[in-house]
């Protein structure tokens, strides 16, 4: 399935099959905090839906040797087969529990580093060098994986429940785009990151020294298109954040018109597009640009998460200097998120009351509320609850 994160039919595209929140609905969201009500997010427990695709790795991470990665509190080994396709197994040999990720790949088999036992992509032991017979009980879980775009996706739940392909982000490997990306491990529950990247109003405060975009103080329009959470917001003329000026070749002090658009097609991935318009471009220069942000989050161990981010510019090539400068600036901003979310997680986890205290919800939390509703629905479909 090919997913394009930008609205393809124009900047002022009307919402089709989507519902924008009415004034009464926004008041309802605001009143949730006043009444002490909230939708649980399960940030201290196992709040990971299994029957969905999660990103396991960037494709480049598994090309040279097996990769060990904790996913949904499960040790997984990811490796590449002879034809270049990915494979994933439980990262523990059933003999004496050595991590298979410390072994090596031989053909399409992964070899345990401890006693040389070999396992196929189905998790079956095909060879035990220290004896003639292969024990038929020597099996480990295997997980469906698929490469889509630049990422390897994994399905940790029931394989029979797979009903879609993972999201493919075409511009990440499109030569007409310049793509900057990074990864960090965050000591916070994944849902905190997901809510954070869908909340634009924190940027004017938490990122006042990095984004330097102080007009992000009002709530965007939040609506649904099918099962996709969407938001959109138009801004008056103002200088663009210095994080992205260099990538677009724009001066940091020039008033620019921009439209912010976001989509979350699944809990695992969301997109934030900057549609930028320069009303008075210099001679021979473009007037319109697009910057596409990508936010991928996958649960790791309890209270820890994997976070991949990307920033793509609709410019065929930017210099290494500009790419390095932009990446350093983005990392500095995201480290501000990381530091705050990690302290938030630690503070709540240390409180003996757990989650049993008031959480106020503001009108600007519309997208975050949608995240929690979707999360609780998916867990309910799997026979689980956070209540």
Language-model regions: role of each:
Residues 5, 59, 96, 148, ...:
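Generic structural signal for bulky hydrophobic/aromatic residues embedded
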Residues 8, 15-16:
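Acidic, Ala/Val/Gly-enriched low-complexity intrinsically disordered segments
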Residues 18-20, 85, 160-387:
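C-terminal catalytic domain of Rieske-type non-heme iron oxygenases
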Residues 1-2:
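Short, small-residue-biased leader/transition segments that mark boundaries at the very start
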Residues 5-6, 24:
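Serine residues within intrinsically disordered or low-complexity segments
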Residues 12, 19-27, 31-36, 41-48, ...:
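Rieske [2Fe-2S] iron-sulfur-binding domain
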């Amino acid at each position: 399935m090919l997913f394009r994160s930008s609205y393809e039919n124009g900047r002022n595209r009307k919402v089709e099959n989507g519902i924008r929140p009415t004034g009464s609905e926004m008041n309802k969201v605001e009143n949730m905090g006043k009444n002490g009500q909230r939708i649980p997010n399960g940030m201290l427990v196992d709040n990971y839906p299994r029957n969905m695709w999660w990103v396991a790795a960037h494709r480049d991470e598994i090309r040279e040797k097996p990769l060990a990665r904790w996913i949904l509190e499960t040790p997984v080994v990811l490796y590449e087969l002879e034809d270049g396709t990915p494979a994933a197994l439980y990262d523990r040999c059933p003999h004496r529990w050595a991590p298979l990720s410390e072994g090596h790949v031989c053909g399409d088999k992964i070899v345990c580093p401890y006693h040389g036992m070999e396992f196929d992509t189905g998790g079956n032991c095909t060879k035990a060098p220290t004896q003639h017979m292969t024990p038929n009980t020597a099996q480990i879980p295997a997980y469906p994986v698929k490469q889509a775009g630049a990422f390897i996706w994994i399905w940790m739940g029931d394989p029979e429940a797979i009903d879609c392909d993972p999201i493919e982000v075409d511009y990440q490997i499109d030569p007409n785009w310049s793509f900057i990306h990074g990864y960090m491990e965050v000591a916070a529950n994944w849902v905190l990151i997901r809510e954070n990247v869908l909340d634009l109003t924190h940027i004017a405060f938490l990122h006042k020294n990095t984004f330097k975009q102080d007009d992000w103080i009002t709530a965007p329009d939040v609506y649904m298109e099918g099962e996709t959470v969407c938001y959109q917001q138009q801004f008056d003329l103002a200088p663009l954040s210095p994080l992205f000026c260099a990538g677009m070749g724009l001066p940091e002090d020039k008033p620019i018109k921009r439209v912010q658009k976001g989509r979350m097609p699944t809990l695992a991935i969301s997109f934030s597009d900057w549609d930028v318009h320069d009303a008075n471009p210099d001679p021979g220069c473009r007037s319109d640009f697009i910057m596409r942000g990508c936010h991928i989050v996958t649960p790791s161990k309890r209270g820890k998460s994997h976070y991949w981010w990307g920033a793509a510019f609709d410019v065929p090539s930017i210099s290494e200097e500009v790419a390095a400068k932009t990446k350093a600036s983005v990392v500095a901003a995201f480290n501000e998120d990381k530091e705050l979310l990690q302290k938030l997680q630690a503070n709540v986890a240390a409180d003996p009351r757990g989650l049993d205290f008031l959480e106020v919800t503001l009108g600007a939390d519309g997208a975050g509320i949608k995240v929690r509703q979707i999360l609780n629905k998916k867990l309910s479909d799997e026979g689980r609850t956070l209540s």
